[in-house]
Amino acid sequence: KASLTAMGLEAKSFKGHLLFEPWTVQTKQGGFYKVYTPLWRAVRDREVPVPLPAPARIPGPETYPSSEALGAWGLGRAMQRGAAIVAGHARVGADLAQERLAEFTSGALRHYGAGRDIPGEDGTSKLAENLALGEITPAQCWHAAQAELDRGNPGAEIFRKELVWREFAYHLLHHTPQILTRNWKPAWDAFPWSEDASSAKFTAWKTGRTGLEF
């Protein structure tokens, strides 16, 4: 914003990536929540504004600046052969994100409480990528869950709690940005991590073979 203002351009920002901005949620002592459950209790009954519909028309400039073809960026190159596998499951864009939400609320949401933890069941919302990319907002998900909650859908409250888990993570990042590069608790600095990248244990971890086989 400062850079744009210096150029004589007005910049405005509007919240939408989170349900509640981190600085609007405080403990009684004026601090931030370091544990999830008290945060959930503090926000579960807060009003979440109903999202506005998309504008019918967005005026464009008389001329557009030169640009590049997105395909030329080779964004999937780093994934190598995995890109083709992921492409079969990705649903990109706001319209498909809304379809995914509708499918979830009319289906798997009813058994979400247990179904989301069972790998053999199609029990999750699959909305993580859409939320991360801004193709759907947490407010849209919240109100869809609220509508199902009003209908007596038993999984709706669990889904709202999961949305607040996402909020909790972002709130911690806002208040303690050092956790991106350092341990949450200094005592963990002495944890005996393995430094041998060629060890059998590290190889097993990279290939998802550290747990119990199904």
Report residues per predicted region.
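Aromatic-residue-lined binding/catalytic grooves and analogous aromatic/hydrophobic interfacial grooves
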Residues: 4-6, 11-12, 28-29, 131, ...
